[in-house]
Swiss-Prot record:
SUPFAM superfamilies: Ribosomal protein S8 (SSF56047). The gene is rps2201. Belongs to the universal ribosomal protein uS8 family. This is Small ribosomal subunit protein uS8A. The keyword Nucleus applies. Its main location: cytoplasm. It comes from Schizosaccharomyces pombe (strain 972 / ATCC 24843). GO terms for biological process: cytoplasmic translation. GO terms for cellular component: cytoplasmic stress granule; cytosol; cytosolic small ribosomal subunit; nucleus.
Length: 130
């Protein structure tokens, strides 16, 4: 299997586990970007909790699922998004304004599109989930 992106593989594993009705999923390898992305998902209530396991290699993450994820994905290439253009991407990627989150990486860290609006920060789109 050819690994395209560590984050893309992680989100794909999460969606597949949700569709199968699993309560937890094991992700490997681990990375800082995946951990920050999962933190945003946890903050918005789409996953219950996750724990990092250090195996002295690339690391593992065990995620406890709660059944709220319908779809999540990575946007590749990571397009630059100005503050005024965030609304356009919300309309393209999410089913509704009230449902779902777009995750951005900004100079102030990885955050949701609502946080980026509040902090007046643009950045690059990492992915989305709803």
């Amino acid at each position: 299997m050819v690994r395209q992106s560590v984050l893309a593989d992680c989100l794909n594993n999460i969606v597949n586990a949700e569709r199968r009705g699993r309560r937890q999923v094991l992700i490997r390898p681990s990375s800082k970007v995946i951990v920050k992305f999962l933190t945003v998902m946890q903050k918005h209530g789409y996953i219950d909790e996750f724990t990092e396991i250090d195996d002295h290699r690339s690391g593992k993450i065990v995620i406890q699922l709660n059944g709220r994820i319908n779809k999540c994905g990575v946007i590749s290439p990571r397009f630059n998004v100005k503050l005024k253009d965030i609304e356009k991407w919300v309309n393209q990627l999410l089913p509704s304004r009230q449902v779902g989150v777009i995750v951005l990486t900004t100079s102030r860290g990885i955050m949701s599109h609502n946080e980026a609006r509040a902090k007046d920060a643009g950045g690059k789109i990492l992915g989305f989930f709803y």
